[in-house]
């Protein structure tokens, strides 16, 4: 009868009949149907009435608790939701409590007042925080809620409490990794201590990635080497290790690690493994190409899965074709990329422009970007690329105008400050202003090797050779790069350390033999490697 009323357009009457039947029969399916009908009719109070009746009639049914909690949150009755959460956790079997506690931040995510949500959850989990079997999970959840509320000190304290409750629990360490950038003083020693022992491979990998971002590459290498030794079947460990070795110019070691990743990933049915496989194969192709092994590079690219990122794959293929002297084919590969949305269309434009810029087709790159920017005039990625093209075209006023607009729109982004400062330094003009801009960039990203390179270069232009040498050596150690090698070698040469300069330039050639800055610098000093 209730369903007939619903079908005939009287959902209210149908709801009442079904709820009455549920009360008489104590049938959970009827209670759930009543709740669903009320929710479909956007009647939160009726849904809550049905869920509470369900809980009263069938107290052992935990599904009713879940509905009550979610409905109360939808009605923004946060304090009542906290009480419902406490009851819900308490009534679950012990084996299910930690998983339920871990899901709480997701359940409370829609609450607008994050501080109230965090306070409510901590109060609701009071018993779980004191119980040894649930304390680590509960403190982790409290920490996540405090983090989302912007209460960093409380999030840090929750992390410590969770770690103290159970040193083997992964939750507090995952939370610590998420807080490491915001609270390095507190989280760095905690993580370093934890990583001395045995941890899940995902956690050690996360810590290694954190170290790479600092950048503390030597420490990251140590963590990745241990990860590979302890978990040789963990494919992602080999991938990240190989990519880091490639980035630091250790190509033979990088190839060995990436080959191991390919072996593991190709044997896996995991879809996520295919993403890593594509990245590894493209990196192997790039290394083979750099060493002049062009047919081997083609073989690696031929193995890339069909569902790989089409823009990344096309870019790698175009780069290989370019090195083979097949420029028009390379350009066509990029032009034929199919895009499904605005974001992909922008990425396509950017890789096309970068290819044109690197191959000295600057007017074509400028025209391409101008057309794209008529459709997306506010796109900061397009603006950044336009600034680089303008610099190559020696349209310095237009370049500066674009970069200053970027500074206004993204004052927390160091790259526009660095780009303008470096351009001024490279042209040996307005050096005091260049230093100010680069110093501002370095405040925003103090560990960025490319910004350290820029500051070293402006110091050199200002005649501060000792400062320049120290900055450039630090930058090159952190990020071996052909352009940084060009700058460091020039400083060494001018300071009379010509043997050391030659060694640095040769190392730069191994990294990227066709780097314009490096080639021009060696030519200017008549250096023959």
Across the structure, where does each feature detected by a protein language model lie?
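Alpha-solenoid helical repeat scaffolds
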Residues: 1-7, 16-529
């Amino acid at each position: 009868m209730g369903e007939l009323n619903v079908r005939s357009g009287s959902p209210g009457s149908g709801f009442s009949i079904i709820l009455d039947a549920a009360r008489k029969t104590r049938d959970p399916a009827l209670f759930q149907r009543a709740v669903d009908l009320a929710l479909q009719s956007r009647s939160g109070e009726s849904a809550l009435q049905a869920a509470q009746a369900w809980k009263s009639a069938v107290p052992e049914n935990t599904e009713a608790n879940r509905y009550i909690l979610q409905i109360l949150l939808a009605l923004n009755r946060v304090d009542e939701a906290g009480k419902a959460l406490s009851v819900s956790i308490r009534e679950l079997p012990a084996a299910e409590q930690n998983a339920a506690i871990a899901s709480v931040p997701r359940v409370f995510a829609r609450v607008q007042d994050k501080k109230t949500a965090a306070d409510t959850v901590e109060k609701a989990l009071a018993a779980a925080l004191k119980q040894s079997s649930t304390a680590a999970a509960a403190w982790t959840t409290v920490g996540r809620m405090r983090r989302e509320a912007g209460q960093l000190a409380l999030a840090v304290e929750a992390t410590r409490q969770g770690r103290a409750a159970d040193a083997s629990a992964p939750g507090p360490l995952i939370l610590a990794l998420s807080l490491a950038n915001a609270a390095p003083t507190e989280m760095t020693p905690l993580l370093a201590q934890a990583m001395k022992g045995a941890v899940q491979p995902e956690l050690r990998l996360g810590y290694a990635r954190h170290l790479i971002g600092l950048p503390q590459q030597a420490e990251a290498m140590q963590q990745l080497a241990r990860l590979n030794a302890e978990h040789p079947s963990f494919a992602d460990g080999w991938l990240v290790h190989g990519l880091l070795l490639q980035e630091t110019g250790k190509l033979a070691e990088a190839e060995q690690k990436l080959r191991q990743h390919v072996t593991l990933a190709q044997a896996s049915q995991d879809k996520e493994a295919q993403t890593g496989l594509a990245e590894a194969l493209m990196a192997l192709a790039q290394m083979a190409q750099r060493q002049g092994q062009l047919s081997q590079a083609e073989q690696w690219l031929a193995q890339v899965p069909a569902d790989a990122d089409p823009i990344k794959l096309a870019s790698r293929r175009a780069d290989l074709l370019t090195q083979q002297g097949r420029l028009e084919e390379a350009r066509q590969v990029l032009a034929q990329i199919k895009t499904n949305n605005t974001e992909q269309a922008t990425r396509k434009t950017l890789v096309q422009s970068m290819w044109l810029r690197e191959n000295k087709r600057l007017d074509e790159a400028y025209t391409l970007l101008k057309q794209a920017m008529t459709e997306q005039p506010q796109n900061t990625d397009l603006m950044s690329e336009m600034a680089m093209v303008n610099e190559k075209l020696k349209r310095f006023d237009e370049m500066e105008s674009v970069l200053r607009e970027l500074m206004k729109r993204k004052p927390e982004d160091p790259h526009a400050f660095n780009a303008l400062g470096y351009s001024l330094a490279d042209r040996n003009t307005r050096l005091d202003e260049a230093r100010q801009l680069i110093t501002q960039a370095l405040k925003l990203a103090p560990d960025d090797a490319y910004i350290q390179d820029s500051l070293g270069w402006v110091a050199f232009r200002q005649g501060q050779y000792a400062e320049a040498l120290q900055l450039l050596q630090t930058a090159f150690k952190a990020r071996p790069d052909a352009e940084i090698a060009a700058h460091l070698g020039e400083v060494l040469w001018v300071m009379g350390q010509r043997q050391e300069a030659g060694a640095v330039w040769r190392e730069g050639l191994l990294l990227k033999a066709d780097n314009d800055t490096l080639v021009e610098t060696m030519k200017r000093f008549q250096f023959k490697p």
